[in-house]
């Protein structure tokens, strides 16, 4: 029987442990700009997927995603050992790392919404000065009203 609450608690704890270990214990400069964003644990508690983002050295720099992925793969065993030492579970989950695409997806959605808002404002401006084509009341019959 799967205990989802326990899996969620374990995932949160693994996320904290891995983030702290990357910051303080793993000595790899390629992980300086890595941020752990989320962790998911399978129902049997044997596998954990750690989601991460990478930022550049400055705002204008592109992040080195490949180097960060290689560094995480290289440090995977060390991180699993650290997780195992700090968790009180019978089996230490295997760790896998995946780049978190949520920030890029949300930025794309924000861009689409901004374009839609701009188009709505443009149409509202055009509508202010617009005149109806034809009569103001095209379905009214003036002759029928005079009878």
Curated annotation (Swiss-Prot):
Any GO BP annotation: maturation of SSU-rRNA
GO molecular function: ribosomal small subunit binding
Biased composition (Basic and acidic residues): 137-147
InterPro entries per record: KH_dom-like_a/b, RbfA, RbfA_dom_sf, Ribosome-bd_factorA_CS
Subcellular location: Cytoplasm
Gene3D superfamilies: 3.30.300.20
One Pfam family linked to the record: RBFA
Chain segments carrying region Disordered: 126-147
SUPFAM superfamilies for the chain: Ribosome-binding factor A, RbfA
PROSITE patterns per UniProt: RBFA
Keywords: Cytoplasm, Ribosome biogenesis
A single Gene Ontology CC term: cytosol
NCBIfam families linked to this entry: rbfA (TIGR00082)
Membership in a protein family: Belongs to the RbfA family.
SUBUNIT field: Monomer. Binds 30S ribosomal subunits, but not 50S ribosomal subunits or 70S ribosomes.
UniProt function note: One of several proteins that assist in the late maturation steps of the functional core of the 30S ribosomal subunit. Associates with free 30S ribosomal subunits (but not with 30S subunits that are part of 70S ribosomes or polysomes). Required for efficient processing of 16S rRNA. May interact with the 5'-terminal helix region of 16S rRNA.
The protein's name in its UniProt record: Ribosome-binding factor A
Organism: Corynebacterium diphtheriae (strain ATCC 700971 / NCTC 13129 / Biotype gravis)
């Amino acid at each position: 029987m799967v205990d989802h609450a326990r899996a969620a608690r374990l995932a949160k704890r693994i996320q904290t442990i891995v983030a702290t270990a990357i910051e303080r214990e793993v000595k790899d400069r390629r992980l300086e700009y890595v941020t752990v964003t989320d962790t998911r644990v399978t129902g049997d508690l044997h596998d954990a997927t750690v989601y991460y983002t990478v930022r550049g050295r400055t705002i204008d720099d592109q992040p080195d995603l490949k180097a960060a992925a290689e560094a995480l793969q290289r440090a995977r065993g060390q991180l699993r050992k650290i997780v195992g030492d700090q968790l009180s579970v019978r089996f230490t989950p295997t760790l896998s790392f995946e780049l978190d695409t949520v920030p890029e997806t949300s930025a794309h959605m924000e861009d689409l919404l901004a374009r839609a808002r701009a188009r709505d404002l443009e149409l509202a401006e055009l509508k202010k000065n617009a005149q109806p084509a034809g009569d103001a009341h095209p379905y009214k019959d003036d002759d029928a009203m005079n009878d």
